[in-house]
Amino acid sequence: MSKQIQAIRGMNDCLPEQSGLWQWAEKAIREVVASYGYQEVRTPIVESTDLFKRSIGEVTDIVEKEMYTFADRNDDSLTLRPEGTASVVRAGNEHGLLYNQQQRLWYLGPMFRHERPQKGRYRQFHQFGVEVFGLAGPDIDAEVIALSARLWKKFGISEQVTLELNSLGSNEARETYRKALVEFLLARKEHLDEDSLRRLESNPLRVLDSKNPQVQAAITDAPSLIDYLDAESKEHFHALCERLDALGIQYRVNPRLVRGLDYYNRTVFEWVTDSLGAQGTVCAGGRYDGLVEQLGGKSTQGVGFAIGMERLVLMLQASGAEEFVASPVDVYVTAMGDEVELYALQIAESLRDVMPTLRVQTHFGGGNFKKQMKRADKSAARVALVLGETEQQEEQVSIKFLREDKPQSRIARSELESTLVELFSL
């Protein structure tokens, strides 16, 4: 026997018993973004490596350690996308969607990062995200945060997540803060790990993002970015907080929140949870007013967020959301005898013609009554249509209830559609 091929480490299969919850979550997401008037955009999985070096930043863990990068036959450097924002901006620039326009977009799809697999984190993972372009005010920041809050409400997990908020200010304000932070960190250099020392030279704000407890202890008294904000950024942040207060969205200002990508300015936020272990971020985003121009477009403001779908699904499983997932089958059609199989096939197809939302599965492979009922029960269908020679000869159908304590009944085939419409409230 040949050696069985396994999935690549960190690449996860979504099996039928899991896909129902994914589909339920994706449907809920589509309903919420539609209620805000956002439109879907789909971008390629493979992009030029330069796109991510210029957007995410060359001195980031993603670009330095985690990207799946390869040379194609033309020796061009290509990368499996590690996140969605850069691709959406690239598409917007390329197709003239952004300059002097307002766009509210969303996406959902697979991303790739070569990081250590752990609970809810895989090397191929899925992100849902929204990106808004052409609006500079705090009102749109509030809207995208409100949209994310509405998703938690839709999923029934609002009590499990906390909104953390910060402002990174303008580039000029960050540069002033950067100097103060570097001075502070240099005085505590012996307490920094190798990663933090490297970041100290290239991107000192990222030291604040360190997960090392020793580093965290050393930066407890670090200067706060909020104290260095320019007047316009302070006003923007204050106005955002006012809007969140008016909407009843609770938040906590976290002066250490800097985000792991280089393109953010002003508003940054994360929804965190303690139900997923130490790394508890389930949603993150912020404002990136310079990114469009950085990637070759004309100056256009942007703001958005992304949700890790694997982490979201873990939370939904823990909260019991699977009870809302419909069974994959409503009606299981059986055929007692080879001569009856054609009759069963005709009935199943006629039901799909008349009731396209009804999920009908037909039994194939023969077997006695007991075997077919066992398959019907395993399908999780609510009812089985029992068809034998008598039913075929008399143009009838027997209905057996699989989940309710009701007697089996026989009706005319002509009454089947109306009976099922009433039974399933179609």
From Swiss-Prot:
It catalyses: tRNA(His) + L-histidine + ATP = L-histidyl-tRNA(His) + AMP + diphosphate + H(+). It comes from the Bacteria. It is an enzyme of class 6 (ligase). GO terms for biological process: histidyl-tRNA aminoacylation. Pfam families: HGTP_anticodon, tRNA-synt_His. GO terms for molecular function: ATP binding; histidine-tRNA ligase activity. InterPro entries: aa-tRNA-synth_II (IPR006195), aa-tRNA-synth_II/BPL/LPL (IPR045864), Anticodon-bd (IPR004154), Anticodon-bd_dom_sf (IPR036621), His-tRNA-ligase (IPR015807), HisRS-like_core (IPR041715), HisRS/HisZ (IPR004516), HisRS_anticodon (IPR033656). It is found in: Cytoplasm. Its EC number is 6.1.1.21. GO terms for cellular component: cytoplasm. Belongs to the class-II aminoacyl-tRNA synthetase family. NCBIfam families: hisS. This is Histidine--tRNA ligase. It comes from Pseudoalteromonas atlantica (strain T6c / ATCC BAA-1087). The gene is hisS.
